[in-house]
């Protein structure tokens, strides 16, 4: 603060003398606090963990410090298992476990140092939540954890804790750059099939493979294979650069790999920065630095700091790109992995779910035309979770309440957005009487495009063949006309995908009917000679 030393500014802020105009909305904060505290919003119930510290004076006078971390290490080693956890069903069980640990580490002649024991019991799983007005970057509410606070200015999981963002990062590091600068559209397809790069094999959460799949569907259903292949196409460096530009300060060069598209990061990200990134998409592609105050005034009313004049703003993706991503994420809410978070009421909602390996982290990131909200949930010690739906529960109940008195509206469509009919299996223009004759039903559908990106080529993943019903093979020149039918096949599908059973393989294409190998006239003439 201008004119203040660091110590003077600290005292003025926390002990009086300065007026801080906060961006917090007390009503929204109250709603967040109430819903985070409501145990009914947590699927698997509540457990309890703790922060522990105590000192032991050993027989020879040496002082040793023990913590919850040393406790974890001690029992994992003692039990020869990595599954030991300090998450218990009650506070009483926590205290009993601590007492047993103290007993186990105290040797003969050792003593617990008086007044050295510190125990703080906390609920698990923990959560972090941030609600931001995307048009300004102003934080309206923030929750740094659940349970009673140990004191003022304690650890805030929303601003200080870095955790893996999981599939919420697919939008940030893959699909935003793919649509914005990678030459992709929502209709662009990848073959969702078994996929290995080097010694790394990628899989989908469902362990199934859908074949040729559009980016829109991959966002809606959170399909990993399509995401990784898309980033491979556009280049890891492009994905990394876009993620950085979205405001993430914890990325490192070790994150320059395909894993960034799935949210597999070296350090992870904070809930606050993830909220700001999604807020940029909600704000027509313009990033606003998160702010907790607008102005700081001295006791005479003089403006010492004016955040509205100094906050960082930049366009991170085109307005058209932001709208296209938003439209795909609307599908997430109504027919995809985010249906549980959808609160209805006619208010437009867009979002993306996320989980990490063994469900250690669960997230939901989403927005309306008014607010952006991101919820993270997980155990402080990174334990495996048995349920991951509660971030969606929290997002739904909080966002429904804070929008109760707001006018329902949709996201405004930019003038540069157009529509075109394409084939779902190629992302290209459909071939007449081919793509709509797919054995599973028509594959033609209407998609949105940024101006200038509508495909001009025809589908290259469907083919129409004349098939002999007698042999089931490609009809030859001697097959009777009344036994020949026209069928549509997929071409280029990989083995193991849902498309493969409808695929005309190279072997199939190169083989023709072996029943009608010669003409009927030639056969009758041969019989007459005999």
Positions of PLM-derived features:
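Long, well-ordered, tryptophan-enriched scaffold segments
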Residues: 1-4, 26-27
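Extracytoplasmic
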Residues: 15-17, 124-127, 168-169, 185, ...
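A penicillin-recognizing enzyme superfamily signal
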Residues: 22-64, 70-121, 125-133, 138-143, ...
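Active/ligand-binding-proximal structured segments within catalytic/core domains
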Residues: 152-178
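Conserved catalytic neighborhood of penicillin-recognizing serine enzymes
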Residues: 183-239, 299-326, 330-331
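Mid-domain, small-residue-enriched loop/turn segments at the edges of structured enzyme/sensor domains
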Residues: 201-204, 235-276
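Conserved small/polar residues in nucleotide/adenosyl-binding loops
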Residues: 218, 521-528
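Low-complexity, Gly/Ser/Thr/Pro-rich intrinsically disordered linker/tail segments
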Residues: 426-524
